[in-house]
């Protein structure tokens, strides 16, 4: 009988310890309060820092507590152009400047935003990776919703009270820089999760993978596998509608969809 394969080991149920002990903390907006709903709060960026395991830099923003004599420190995903000492304004009456946080209803159509909330007060969900941004498409004042174009190209309708940061997330173009050597990839994934190096199935022994074994590296059977295949067999092209290169009409249709 074969062994438990890699795809089964990384599934739910096994012991997993997240690599979070060296991270700076969760990056999110301030907790939504009376000050942000009705006016604005002023904060200052004390430092821009690197968070291990995250592509985008983080900005540590210090706010004065609205009621008590103390300061509040928050970690924001840094927008392109943020700098140490910059004042950041959060709230309904904040100005349209890069780094400021406003509700979507206060942001004009066509504006570039990032770290957009999905529900009012969830402190930021969409467009948070390095170089990402979302575009405000339209507002619907009748039902209080806003249509937003996400980095994937999908268009999503969210409540107009959801907050967003003006600008694009810093660190764009990070993935275009070549890794150059295995050591760089080692350090990159060491702070993320155990997913590197990734050995191909055809390079394994037959006991370790359905694609393993043989006198030369080949799968030996169809690489497509049915949707209801059991774990351990479900590797390769799962429930593929088609395989191979796009040719003829299919290629033209795909090219037209990419342009749109």
Swiss-Prot record:
The lineage of its organism: Eukaryota, Viridiplantae, Streptophyta, Embryophyta, Tracheophyta. GO terms for cellular component: cytosolic large ribosomal subunit. Belongs to the universal ribosomal protein uL2 family. Keywords: Cytoplasm, Ribonucleoprotein, Ribosomal protein. It comes from the Eukaryota. It holds the Pfam family Ribosomal_L2_C. Its main location: cytoplasm. One of its GO terms (biological process) is cytoplasmic translation. GO terms for molecular function: RNA binding; structural constituent of ribosome. It is found in: Cytoplasm. InterPro entries: NA-bd_OB-fold (IPR012340), Rib_uL2_dom2 (IPR014722), Ribosomal_uL2 (IPR002171), Ribosomal_uL2_arc_euk (IPR023672), Ribosomal_uL2_C (IPR022669), Ribosomal_uL2_CS (IPR022671), Ribosomal_uL2_dom3 (IPR014726), Ribosomal_uL2_RNA-bd_dom (IPR022666). Residues 1-24 are annotated as: Disordered. Gene3D superfamilies: 2.30.30.30, Nucleic acid-binding proteins, Ribosomal protein L2, domain 3. The keyword Nuclease does not apply. SUPFAM superfamilies: Nucleic acid-binding proteins, Translation proteins SH3-like domain. This is Large ribosomal subunit protein uL2.
